[in-house]
């Protein structure tokens, strides 16, 4: 994705988890936070998949507290769920059914990320 961006930007990473195997734990765990000062800046959250929406909602609340100028969401995949909140400024690659998928960066217990395509895990 970064190879396609033609503007000067700063990139930072965070790590959030909420799954054990194929099931969500219901808890959002922030394993690594960003180190950049994002106050007054335009932020783009890049996500592999939006499933229940709990993780993205957690991140939106977190970043809104940091007084970002704007927050946009880019996701490769979004499951067809109804969320308890409104997603705005979202850019979604593909909307998919309620199935557990792996490959192309998506994992199951830290496996299958390196698959070159996306597959349904049965």
Model-derived regions: residue spans:
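PRPP-associated nucleotide enzymes
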Residues: 1-122
